[in-house]
Amino acid sequence: MSFKTLCLATALTVCFNLPASAGAIMVQDPYARASGKSATSGAAFMMLMNHGAVDDRLVGVTSDAAKKVELHTHSEDANGVMKMRHLVEGAVIPAGGMHALERGGDHVMFMGLSAPMTQGDEISVTLMFENAGAVSITVPVDLK
């Protein structure tokens, strides 16, 4: 491998491993959970950071990976049963703070998958923020 090729490969590796950002919002460590071959839904998780001076809000999510993509959370009902529900109001990312989209909490929910989420695949996702606007990211599918 020539020195020029090595430098180019290194530069591309660094560029593709940088967090995605738009304005004050940065998205770090996104991943989707691998699904079974017959699964019709899946989920993605990531860390959202707001380096700005004002709160922002994640208000929507889109992807061609499923017929419907929403921001969901888990909550406990009166009988102590955990249920998933759509976060219609979105999720606030506080100024100078962060918000985790994580298992057992807020997360991106894919319903009506176009294809199974297979280990090693990548999913294109666009996050819509109230202030920062659209942030397009690539979400790797992992068995984490």
Predicted regions: what they are:
Residues 23-144:
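Compact, glycine-rich, soluble single-domain proteins
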Residues 7-17:
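Bacterial N-terminal signal peptides
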